[in-house]
Amino acid sequence: MKTHNDILAALAALPLFLTGAAFAAEPGMLDTLRNNIVQTWEQPQHYDLYLPAITWHARFAYSQEKIDSYNERPWGAGFGQSRWDEKGNWHGLYLMAFKDSFNKWEPIGGYGWEATWRPLEGSDFHWGAGYTVGVTMRDNWRYIPIPVILPMASVGYGPLTLQMTYIPGTYDNGNVYFAWLRLQF
């Protein structure tokens, strides 16, 4: 019988299987992902408030008419839980909903990981780079669950962090910068 932790880990790892990345992964990589997800779920150190900040469509990839029609102020909110590991890296589980490019609600949930650096000794300033693995749903895709694996970067001070990702794409599709504030408490 599956526990809810196994189900949670399977849902978060679903995008890896659907994109074929799981088949290229070295042995143990998915176990590490699963263990990190379960540990973050069972042993959170913090709870997080997510506030979407900006959606920016790459100007080289869209006509001005399209850009003018898109929403680039994705108001919404989210909640999550997170922890810092023994290396100082960040792990988080999150659910967020925001207004997408078409001003329709887009929920997203998943797991994020960032290697984190503190370049100024004794300072609360930090920056990071990593990835997020999750599932989103969009109005223009009839709210069918869509797996995502995206790069992530951040810069922060103390409990406030600006996290961001870039959704790659083609002309008139994708090529979107998305950023949100994460307040850790």
Swiss-Prot record:
<feature type="active site">
    <location>
        <position position="100"/>
    </location>
</feature>
<dbReference type="Pfam" id="PF07017">
    <property type="entry name" value="PagP"/>
</dbReference>
<feature type="active site">
    <location>
        <position position="101"/>
    </location>
</feature>
<dbReference type="GO" id="GO:0009279">
    <property type="term" value="C:cell outer membrane"/>
</dbReference>
<dbReference type="GO" id="GO:0009245">
    <property type="term" value="P:lipid A biosynthetic process"/>
</dbReference>
<comment type="similarity">
    <text>Belongs to the lipid A palmitoyltransferase family.</text>
</comment>
<feature type="active site">
    <location>
        <position position="57"/>
    </location>
</feature>
<keyword id="KW-0732">Signal</keyword>
<comment type="subunit">
    <text>Homodimer.</text>
</comment>
<dbReference type="InterPro" id="IPR011250">
    <property type="entry name" value="OMP/PagP_b-brl"/>
</dbReference>
<keyword id="KW-0472">Membrane</keyword>
<feature type="site" description="Role in the phospholipid gating">
    <location>
        <position position="171"/>
    </location>
</feature>
<keyword id="KW-0808">Transferase</keyword>
<feature type="site" description="Role in lipopolysaccharide recognition">
    <location>
        <position position="66"/>
    </location>
</feature>
<keyword id="KW-0012">Acyltransferase</keyword>
<dbReference type="InterPro" id="IPR009746">
    <property type="entry name" value="LipidA_acyl_PagP"/>
</dbReference>
<dbReference type="GO" id="GO:0016746">
    <property type="term" value="F:acyltransferase activity"/>
</dbReference>
<comment type="function">
    <text>Transfers a fatty acid residue from the sn-1 position of a phospholipid to the N-linked hydroxyfatty acid chain on the proximal unit of lipid A or its precursors.</text>
</comment>
<protein>
    <recommendedName>
        <fullName>Lipid A acyltransferase PagP</fullName>
        <ecNumber>2.3.1.251</ecNumber>
    </recommendedName>
</protein>
<keyword id="KW-0998">Cell outer membrane</keyword>
<feature type="signal peptide">
    <location>
        <begin position="1"/>
        <end position="24"/>
    </location>
</feature>
